[in-house]
Every structure is written in C-alpha cells, then in structure tokens.
C-alpha cells in the first residue's frame, strides 16, 4: 500500500525517541510525537514473556489512554508514572478489544474517574465472560474530540478477534494497530484461539484503504518500531493459510 510500503526507512527516526526511566521494570514509556507516547508493558503467556504496546495522548483536558497495561500489578505504577511526568490525570480509556492486555484496565480507570469506552461488540464479549465493562459503548466506528485533540476508532473487520478495532490520530498520522497488526519481528500470528484468519487479510486491506497516509504504526506486541508490520501481517496470514492448505 502506498504510504505504508517502505515505512522501514522511518524506523531511522526512532533513534531519537525519548525513553523515560520507570520505577517498574515491566513498564516502558517512549515519546513518539509531540503529545503522543507509546507505553510497553511485559507479561508472561504460557511460560514466555511478551511485550504489549499501546499509546496515551496528553491533551489540554487530561490524558487519554488507549488500552491498558498488561496485568493489574502495573496499573497504579503506570498512572503514577504518567502523572509524575505530565501532572495530569487519566480522563478517558478506550479498549480496542476484549482481551486482558486491552480491556483489563477498564475497571481501574473507571474507579479513577475516567470515562471508559469500548465498542458494543467488545462489551457483549466482556459481559458473557463476566469481566468488568466500559461505562460507555459505541458502534464499531466513532470519532472523538478531547480538548483540541481529535482521533478516530475504526473497525476494519474480523482478524485477531471478532471485535478488534484500531485507533487513528490524524494530526500525527499515527495508527494504533492493536493486536490485529503483528510486529515486524513476529514469527507467527500468535494466539489465534479467537481469530478469524480467513477474514484477516481483507480487514488489513480495509485499514490500508481507510488510512493511506500512515507514518507510524504501533503494533500490539513486541517491536513496534519496525514499520514493516502491516505487510508482515499479510505475509504471516498467507503463510498460515498455505500451511493449513498443505496439511489438509
């Protein structure tokens, strides 16, 4: 896709990213754009340690957090750290799908007084699983404006899960891909227990068509600085499908 192909060269620009010293070694925060930060948290899944990436935006009204730290033990450390740095509180939290590395902080942020959001589809899944839910829900696509900051939540279709959405920050041309976008160093599609692999390719193409001028893509796990993630995701899907076909 024009605008996403060749984004590897942009990775050179990441060498100047500012990394903040955190008290919790399982939390890392890096400045991506003027008021947009990537936060990475670490947790163990089936005996292997993984990194989960998401972002927060500092606005004139307060801080908007997309997704949540991966693991309850990191919630307070995370909010303490960003308050210490910015002197502002979290006023909004949006979960990009129902898994714990995305929706796990809804209850915590809600108790802090933040407005919490998810799609109705995510809310339905959380309800069935008896997990904490967002206070506010919306249909698959929604535009937000917080102070002077505008961003958009977009549902591209099924992929990693039925309910996965992405978040677009138009001013910064940053796409928060969540778990539907695999990192450039991913060896496979990861957890696919709730995936719709046959729909995944079209959903990625929908993202490409919707946001043709992306400059930075933040993949949901592992190395988000490798800007080949969109194409690599398509390659991984194709590889998986070929293996499945060969085994049948």
Curated annotation (Swiss-Prot):
Cofactor(s) listed in the protein's UniProt record: Zn(2+)
Main EC class the enzyme belongs to: hydrolase
GO cellular component: a single term: periplasmic space
Origin superkingdom: Bacteria
Residues involved in Zn(2+) 1 binding: 97, 99, 160
GO BP: antibiotic catabolic process; response to antibiotic
Protein name, per record: Metallo-beta-lactamase type 2
Originating species: Elizabethkingia meningoseptica
Gene transcribed to yield this protein: blaB7
């Amino acid at each position: 896709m024009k605008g996403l192909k060749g984004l590897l060269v942009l990775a050179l620009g990441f060498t100047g990213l500012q990394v903040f010293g955190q008290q919790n070694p399982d939390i890392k925060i890096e400045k991506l754009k003027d008021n947009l930060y990537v936060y990475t948290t670490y947790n163990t899944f089936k005996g292997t340690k993984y990194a989960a990436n998401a972002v927060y935006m500092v606005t004139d009204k307060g801080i908007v957090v997309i997704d949540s730290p991966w693991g309850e033990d990191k919630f307070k450390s995370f909010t303490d750290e960003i308050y210490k740095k910015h002197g502002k509180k979290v006023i909004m939290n949006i979960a990009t799908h129902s898994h714990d590395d995305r929706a796990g902080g809804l209850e915590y942020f809600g108790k802090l007084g933040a407005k919490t959001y998810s799609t109705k589809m995510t809310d339905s899944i959380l309800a069935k699983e008896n997990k904490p839910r967002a206070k506010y829900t919306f249909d698959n696509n929604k535009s937000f404006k917080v102070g002077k900051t505008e961003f958009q939540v977009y549902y591209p279709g099924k992929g990693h899960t039925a309910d996965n959405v992405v978040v677009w920050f138009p001013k910064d041309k940053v796409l928060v891909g969540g778990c539907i976008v695999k990192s450039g160093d991913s060896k496979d599609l990861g957890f696919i227990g709730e995936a719709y692999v046959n729909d995944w390719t079209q959903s990625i193409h929908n993202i490409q068509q919707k946001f043709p001028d992306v400059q930075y893509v933040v993949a949901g796990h592992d190395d988000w600085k490798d800007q080949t993630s969109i194409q690599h995701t398509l390659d991984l899907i194709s590889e998986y499908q070929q293996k499945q076909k060969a085994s049948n």
